[in-house]
């Protein structure tokens, strides 16, 4: 289907998901591996900088550590997994696990450049930090990607409306389905 009007007056539910937020303003951004690409099998080195300490970034860092790799988390905010709607048991466990296993976590730190074999970040004190790494995984979030605008007969659900977690997107879809 190339045009929503092909459905006539029937309601249409669009669940086209989201696209990764690419950090195009960061020199060397093209050297990064997007989080979903890693999850789909893209190989990484032994020391991996994970850019983004939200749920996806932390779960990827956790998986890397379980595989015997050395993750390093770089997060702009002042805490890991700070988004709303995440199960407290998950976020608390991840924070505590990283602390217990001495996983390097850089909070209030911004990625400045991706180089071959390292990244340069700016810490909360304004000073640059050089972090050696073999690979860089970008987990900088997602941007809704709807195919059409919401209207009387067009309903957006899931990440194309607002990026969320599995629970929130399923709830939104259920609400729309019940209203139709």
Please name every model-derived segment.
Residues 1, 99-111:
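A conserved beta-strand/loop element that lines the FAD pocket in flavoprotein oxidoreductases
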Residues 1-5, 11, 15-25, 36-85, ...:
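Rossmann-like dinucleotide/flavin-binding elements
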Residues 25-28, 95-102, 150-151:
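Short, conserved catalytic or adaptor-binding loops enriched in Gly and charged residues
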Residues 29, 42-48, 108, 116:
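Phosphate-coordination loops involved in phosphoryl transfer and adenosine-cofactor binding
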Residues 33, 104-106, 155:
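General small-molecule cofactor/ligand-binding pocket signal
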Residues 88-92:
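Charged helix-capping and loop-helix junction motifs
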Residues 94-95, 136:
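Acidic, Ser/Thr-rich peripheral helices and adjacent loops at domain boundaries
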Residues 117-122:
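Short polybasic amphipathic segments
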């Amino acid at each position: 289907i190339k045009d929503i009007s092909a459905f006539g007056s029937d309601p249409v539910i669009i669940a086209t998901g989201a696209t990764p937020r690419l950090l195009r303003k960061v020199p060397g951004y093209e050297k990064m591996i997007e989080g979903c690409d890693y999850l789909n099998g893209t190989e990484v080195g032994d020391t991996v900088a994970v850019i983004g300490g939200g749920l996806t970034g932390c779960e990827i860092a956790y998986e890397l550590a379980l595989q015997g790799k050395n993750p390093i988390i770089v997060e702009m905010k002042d805490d890991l997994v700070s988004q709303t709607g995440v199960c407290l048991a998950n976020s608390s466990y991840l924070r505590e696990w990283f602390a217990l296993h001495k996983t390097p976590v850089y909070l209030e730190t911004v990625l400045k450049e991706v180089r071959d074999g390292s990244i340069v970040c700016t810490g909360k004190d304004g000073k640059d930090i050089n972090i050696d790494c073999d690979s860089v995984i970008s987990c900088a979030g997602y941007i809704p990607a709807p195919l059409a605008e919401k209207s009387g007969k067009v309903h957006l659900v899931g990440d194309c409306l607002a990026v969320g977690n599995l629970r929130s997107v399923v709830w939104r879809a259920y609400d729309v389905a019940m209203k139709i």
